[in-house]
From Swiss-Prot:
The active site is at R214, K245, H379, R382, W405, Y414 (o-(3'-phospho-dna)-tyrosine intermediate). This is Integrase. The lineage of its organism: Bacteria, Bacillati, Actinomycetota, Actinomycetes, Pseudonocardiales. It comes from Saccharopolyspora erythraea. Belongs to the 'phage' integrase family. Residues 179-428 form the Tyr recombinase domain.
Length: 437
């Protein structure tokens, strides 16, 4: 027989024995998305269990972190929803590519089967997962990047009430040794500039060393952004290669001809970089071969931040080098005739098309070899430019504007002490302690 119930005040929880022989609990959690009261129901054989569950719901409600109604989400479902429907609204292309790799290649295969509301209490699951990644041969930096992606994704789940706490913010991230950057010394810079100016687009690398432009910013420079009267250069865009997407209805079948079924042999000469792994059974990649491909190739995008949109005044010699380069490009344009693609790019292929970032990187490596200078990343040119500003004693505010930094804290990452500065300090100490009064 159903236990007689008295009407509780609005918002109060109710516990009663039903005709079905089960104890029932009903808790008002707030207002649902449809504007109606969000009333949760608990059903158990034992009254104490119902009392306990009702208490949990009440504490959840009172804390302000109410879980959404409906079937509990798995980690896979949430990560897929986040990376496909939430992150793209605010993230740039390269950031999204990193998120997609972390989610689809690592997080979903490793943790996707867990229930979202249960894994929140087990940060150790993530720590064990990172350890498995590293033990499988992946670099700690890769595991650390996956950790950062998971922290962001689960942080969004917390904000939206899917979980009551972010387990990834508690989990220990893999330790990553910070890569030591050695900017080029003055003598090396001079050798690099000399070797670069022997090549078609050599001024592009002089700009990188002198102004600290990022690779994409350098390749996206256009002639209309050069102010010849004021001798300034406006930096507002970046050039990047984006991945093509299938425009067809059956991506797997479309790319079937290019599916890799076996790993490369030990003495593989086909790939200049690391050999790619075999394709998964349901591979939907190889979109660049799709006749209806969309959204890929070289794309001009906005610079990374508002601070990145900047105007720099050119040193006289650099300005003259740019004008000389313009004349040489004009001769190339006349020689190419109708084959020339006029995109107003400052640095181009012989037919006027923009330069691919990979081709640009290969050119940089060749310049270093020709100059007899040690190996250095192309981005080290930006570190070198920032360090030169340090040596020259340029005020922090001016450095921020020239480099396109949004925060002065970037100075700690980009400015380095080079040998000439160390030697100067040693000379000063020598004079102070052992010099003649």
């Amino acid at each position: 027989m159903e236990q007689k119930r008295t009407r509780n005040p609005n918002g109060r929880s109710t516990i009663y024995l039903g005709n079905d022989g089960y104890w029932h609990g009903r808790v008002t959690m707030g207002i649902g998305d449809d504007g109606k009261p969000d009333r949760r129901h608990v059903k158990r054989k034992d009254k104490d269990e119902v009392v306990e569950e009702v208490g949990k719901l009440e504490r959840e409600r009172d804390s302000g972190n109410v879980r959404k109604k409906g079937q509990p989400w798995t980690v896979e479902r949430w990560l897929t929803h986040w990376v496909e429907s939430i992150a793209p609204l605010t993230c740039r292309y390269k950031t999204m590519r990193g998120y997609q790799t972390a989610v689809y290649k690592h997080l979903i295969p490793g943790l996707g089967a867990h229930r979202l509301d249960r894994i929140q209490n087990h940060p150790e699951y993530f720590e064990k997962f990172y350890l498995r990644m590293i033990e499988s041969g992946l670099k700690p930096a890769t595991a650390h990047q996956v950790h950062r992606t998971a922290r962001t994704a689960f942080g969004e789940a917390y904000k939206r009430g899917r979980i009551q706490r972010n387990p990834v913010s508690i989990a220990k991230a893999p330790r990553v040794e910070e890569e030591e950057v050695e900017p080029l010394e003055v003598e090396d810079m001079q050798l690099v500039i000399k070797a670069a100016l022997e090549r078609r687009n050599g001024v592009r690398y002089v700009i990188a060393l002198a102004l600290g432009t990022r690779q994409g910013e350098s390749l996206a420079l256009k002639w209309p952004r050069l102010n010849r009267q004021k001798r300034t250069l406006r930096i507002t865009k970046a050039l990047q290669r984006q991945t093509w997407k299938h425009g067809c209805s059956d991506p797997h079948r479309c790319g079937a001809t290019y599916h890799k079924t076996e790993p490369c042999k030990a003495a593989c000469k086909r790939h200049t970089r690391a050999c790619p792994p075999p394709c998964p059974p349901a591979c939907t990649e190889h979109a660049r071969w799709c006749p209806q491909r969309t959204g890929g190739g070289l794309v001009e995008v906005d610079v990374k931040s508002r601070a990145g949109r900047r105007t720099v005044t050119l040193p006289d010699q650099l300005f003259d080098l740019i004008l000389k380069h313009e004349k040489l490009q004009g001769a190339e344009r006349e020689l190419a005739g109708t084959e020339w693609h006029d995109g107003e790019w400052m640095f181009t292929q012989p037919n006027g098309k923009p330069i691919d970032p990979r081709q640009d990187l290969d050119e940089w490596k060749a310049i270093l070899v020709e100059a007899g200078v040690r190996e250095a990343r192309l981005h080290d040119a930006r570190h070198t430019a920032a360090t030169v500003l340090l040596v020259l004693g340029v005020p922090d505010r001016v450095v921020m504007e020239l480099m396109g930094w949004s925060s002065v804290t970037m100075k700690q990452r980009y400015m380095h002490v080079i040998d000439s500065v160390r030697n100067d300090v040693a000379d000063r100490l020598n004079t102070y302690f052992w010099g003649t009064n």
